[in-house]
């Protein structure tokens, strides 16, 4: 008994039940096809003519002669099949026919109307039936292609009376329909013939021209939208929805996303490994051997040298205003680290320091790119971006929500800083081309051995005020969330609620890595990068007026540092502190990467700002020189490449899951930071401890296999001993155990002052002779009666007596640490023979103690 062959479908194709393996079966299939075609020709009978009331003129569209026999070969360019044949067409062929007949309008990456295979084929069948039906109206019916479009868009089937068509419309009311021929057709069996390759004349999926693995991966690829569903919508209605600064597209709803529950599996056993006991001397020795130029680094007076030395700099179009500089406000001191890891002090934004930072971060823009057609090439780069990263169906079905909800969250976040709805400015009345400028007081730690010859330059921040940022940030936040939901599954942006560097079921071992280091990223961006961002934002669904408005005031801007009195014009380059900084840097990096490399060769791609990392089975192939010649970037392909991104190493455990580990070298440097403010109850130090514990929560997952991976990656990246990285993990395990262990890393000299001043009590009374006033006048020293400062102890003659009272609050709260220490030692030097108290006419005066007869009450 012969069993029918399996029907051709994607499911049968993927599970392996479809296909012809032997040449004999191929020949049998072809012979059956020839017999069926011959039988169809023998059984052909023309259908009887239909009697209609109106005659049909013969023209080029007629497909048959009056006797019903085919007269010539029919053109198959557009519409030459019946509805049944359209079912056998591929999706690409249906898209071509859809564009030809319906003529949809393209809006970014979306079509209006959207393509629906079932609706399109049904419209073709209905149009054929309408053209064959008898006429009941005197109006002229549309031609076949226009009729299909009218049925699909649910519009009128007839031409307007006042409008004449460009072509001569033909009133067709017979069975001779353009693109359709009445021929008997029936399938003899359920067998569907396989497709034949045109190149090698073999059954497809067996020929070398076909890549079955690529088809299987493309069909099985998922997006984040498949795992994250909309859980609920919460309405937000108040006065904030009346704001019109962002236009009418604000949607007053809040969309909450929750990851779909993962299947229940057995929990992996705990693989904690005990670490050796370490002390602070061992950690310092690790720093000395790993960072040889950092152990003796001390920048306490480096900025003093810069401010007091001669200064020469070359800048264009810089405006200096030294008349209204803002004085530095002294802080209350910082904790002193025990470890010396090369960490620097806080930088003060003086004029020279700001000019040095602007010279490095904003001025001297590189010009490495070639001359190109910006308009044409920017569109091509944007199209490549969507093809490489975006799932078009998810983008079309995704909602653009959460704008107003994000706006409320932003306002609540900065409510404590004085930001309110009433203080929001009118964006049309603001000059958005003016940006504020400042330098980062915290300098990023340096991992290279260059601290003995090079002084790190602080980074700069160019930003708008919160009132302006609060109106753009909600829009770009919602757009970024939609962008994440439409990404393909192999694309990862490790930021937000739905994405991280934790990758279940993916192993980084035995993979080729590709890491591109882009230096001078912010100031290297020009008009070409801005046009790419504009096309991508429009394609993602950002309102076109907002996109154009945003790009217009980024073409030419002016930055000004009010504290340093420095101003400078800039063009196109990235503003490091506005609402679009991270989003813009990420899409620029992704667009450049997609243009230089074929993204289909990578199993995983990770992007975050200007950082990128790719994993592939085979060595990646591409042209990294285009980063420089086309995109004006100083790019360097890291060799040897290791799984390293966002200052974190990626490791895989024994269960095939990947997790991130912060760079041990940078974490050791953070243990010696000099930026923790002093507080009496150690609240700032405890906040740093909790942040340290959160970053090192991976320690419980570090098995011996993971430690070996980290040691290998550490040695490949830094050319340093990998055994040092394992010792650093032991130190991290100790100092994350409890807060008391962490407190061993810092101390403050203010505690010594508190011990010295511990004998002070409520009031301090000192008696002196009245002749001191005459002696002061004689020496030319005059003091006011209401002067609250303490006069140093000296030798004075006897006479009238007075007393002074200095409260404990004044002595400890309003004086500096130095004056506290000096006052404590001088008070301790005064003899304490007795305790006396005297008043002079009920008044208290600030007078110095006398050398003879001075009595202090404690």
Swiss-Prot record:
Which keywords annotate this record?
Nucleotide-binding, Nucleotidyltransferase, RNA-directed RNA polymerase, Transferase, Viral RNA replication
- Chain intervals with Basic and acidic residues compositional bias: 779-790
Q: Where are the transmembrane segments?
A: none
Q: Which domain of life is it from?
A: Viruses
Q: Name one Pfam family in it.
A: RdRP_2
Q: What class of enzyme is it?
A: transferase
| InterPro entries per UniProt | Bromoviridae_RdRp, DNA/RNA_pol_sf, RNA-dep_RNA_pol_alsuvir, RNA-dir_pol_PSvirus
Keyword check for Iron-sulfur, yes or no.
no
Q: Where is the RdRp catalytic domain?
A: 511-624
- Note whether Nucleotidyltransferase occurs among the keywords: yes
Q: Polar residues composition bias: which ranges?
A: 805-817
Q: Which GO terms describe its molecular function?
A: nucleotide binding; RNA binding; RNA-directed RNA polymerase activity
Q: Where is this region: Disordered?
A: 772-830
Q: What is its EC number?
A: 2.7.7.48
Record's catalysed reaction(s): RNA(n) + a ribonucleoside 5'-triphosphate = RNA(n+1) + diphosphate
Q: Which GO terms describe its biological process?
A: DNA-templated transcription; positive stranded viral RNA replication
Give the record's subunit note: Interacts with replication protein 1a.
Q: What does this protein do?
A: RNA-dependent RNA polymerase which replicates the viral genome composed of 3 RNA segments, RNA1, RNA2 and RNA3.
Protein family membership: Belongs to the ssRNA positive-strand viruses RNA-directed RNA polymerase family.
- Per its record, how is this protein called by name? RNA-directed RNA polymerase 2a
């Amino acid at each position: 008994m012969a069993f029918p062959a399996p029907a051709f479908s994607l499911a049968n194709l993927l599970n392996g039940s479809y296909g012809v393996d032997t040449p004999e079966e191929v020949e049998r299939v072809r012979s059956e096809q020839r017999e069926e075609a011959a039988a169809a020709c023998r059984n052909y009978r023309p259908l009887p003519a239909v009697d209609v009331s109106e005659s049909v003129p013969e023209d080029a569209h007629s497909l048959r002669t009056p006797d019903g026999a085919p007269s010539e070969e029919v053109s198959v360019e557009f519409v030459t099949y019946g509805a049944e044949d359209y079912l056998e067409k591929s999706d690409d062929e249906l898209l071509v026919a859809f564009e030809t007949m319906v003529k949809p309008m393209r809006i970014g990456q979306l079509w209006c109307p959207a393509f629906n295979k079932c609706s399109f084929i049904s419209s073709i069948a209905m149009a054929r039936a309408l053209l064959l039906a008898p006429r009941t109206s005197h109006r002229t019916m549309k031609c076949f292609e226009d009729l299909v479009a009218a049925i699909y868009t649910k519009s009128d089937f007839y031409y307007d009376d006042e409008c004449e068509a460009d072509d001569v419309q033909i009133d067709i009311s017979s069975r001779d329909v353009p693109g359709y021929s009445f021929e008997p057709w029936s399938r003899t069996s359920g067998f569907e013939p396989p497709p034949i390759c045109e190149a090698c004349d073999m059954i497809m999926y067996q020929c070398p021209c076909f890549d079955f693995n690529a088809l299987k991966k493309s069909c099985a690829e998922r997006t984040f939208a498949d795992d994250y569903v909309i859980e609920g919508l919460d309405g937000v209605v108040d006065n904030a929805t009346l704001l019109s600064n962002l236009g009418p597209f604000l949607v007053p709803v809040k969309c909450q996303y929750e990851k779909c529950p993962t299947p229940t599996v057995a929990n992996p056993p705990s693989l904690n490994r005990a670490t050796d006991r370490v002390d602070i001397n061992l950690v310092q020795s690790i720093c000395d051997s790993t960072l040889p130029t950092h152990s003796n680094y001390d920048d306490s007076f480096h900025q003093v040298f810069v401010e007091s030395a001669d200064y020469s700099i070359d800048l264009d179009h810089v405006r200096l205003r030294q008349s209204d500089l803002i004085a530095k406000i002294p802080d209350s001191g910082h904790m002193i680290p025990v470890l010396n890891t090369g960490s620097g002090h806080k930088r003060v934004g003086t004029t020279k320091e700001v000019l040095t930072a602007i010279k490095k971060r904003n001025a001297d823009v590189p010009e490495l790119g070639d001359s190109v057609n910006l308009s044409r090439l920017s569109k091509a780069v944007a199209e490549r971006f969507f093809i490489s990263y975006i799932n078009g169906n998810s983008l079309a079905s995704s909602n653009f929500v959460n704008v107003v909800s994000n706006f409320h969250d932003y306002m609540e976040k900065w409510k404590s800083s004085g930001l309110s709805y009433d203080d929001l400015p009118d964006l049309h009345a603001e000059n958005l081309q003016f940006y504020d400028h400042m330098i980062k007081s915290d300098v990023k730690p340096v991992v290279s051995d260059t601290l003995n010859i090079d002084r790190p330059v602080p980074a700069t921040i160019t930003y708008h005020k919160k009132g302006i940022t609060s109106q753009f940030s909600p829009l770009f936040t919602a757009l970024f969330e939609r962008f994440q939901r439409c990404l393909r599954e192999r694309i990862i942006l490790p930021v937000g609620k739905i994405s991280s560097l934790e990758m279940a079921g993916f192993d980084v071992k035995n993979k080729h890595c590709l890491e591109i280091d882009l230096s001078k990223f912010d100031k290297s961006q020009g008009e070409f990068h801005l046009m790419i961002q504009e096309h991508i934002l429009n394609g993602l669904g950002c309102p076109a007026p907002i996109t154009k408005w945003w790009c217009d005031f980024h073409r030419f801007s002016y930055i000004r540092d009010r504290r340093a009195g420095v101003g400078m014009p800039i063009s196109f380059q990235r503003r490091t502190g506005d609402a679009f900084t991270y989003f813009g840097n990420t899409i620029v990096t992704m667009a450049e990467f997609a243009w230089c490399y074929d993204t289909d060769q990578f199993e995983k791609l990770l992007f975050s700002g200007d950082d990128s990392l790719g994993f592939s089975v085979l060595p990646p192939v591409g042209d990294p020189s285009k980063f420089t010649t086309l995109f004006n970037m100083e790019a360097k392909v890291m060799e040897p490449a290791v799984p390293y991104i966002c200052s974190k190493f990626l490791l895989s455990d024994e269960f095939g899951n990947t997790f991130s580990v912060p760079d041990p070298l940078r974490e050791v440097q953070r243990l010696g930071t000099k930026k923790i403010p002093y507080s009496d109850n150690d609240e700032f130090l405890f906040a740093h401890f909790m942040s340290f514990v959160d970053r090192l929560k991976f320690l419980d997952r570090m098995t011996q296999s993971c430690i070996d991976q980290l040691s290998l990656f550490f040695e490949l990246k830094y050319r340093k001993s990998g055994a040092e990285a394992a010792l650093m993990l032991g130190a991290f395990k100790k100092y994350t155990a409890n807060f008391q262990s962490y407190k061993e890393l810092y101390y403050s000299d203010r505690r010594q002052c508190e011990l010295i001043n511990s004998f002070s009590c409520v009031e301090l009374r000192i008696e002196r002779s009245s002749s001191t006033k005459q002696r002061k006048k004689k020496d030319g020293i005059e003091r006011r009666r209401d002067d609250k400062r303490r006069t140093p102890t000296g030798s004075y003659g006897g006479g009238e007596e007075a007393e002074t009272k200095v409260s404990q609050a004044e002595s400890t709260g309003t004086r500096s640490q130095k004056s506290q220490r000096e006052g404590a030692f001088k008070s301790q030097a005064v003899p304490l023979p007795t305790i006396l108290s005297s008043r002079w006419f009920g008044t208290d005066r600030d007078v110095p103690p006398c050398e003879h007869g001075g009595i202090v009450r404690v």
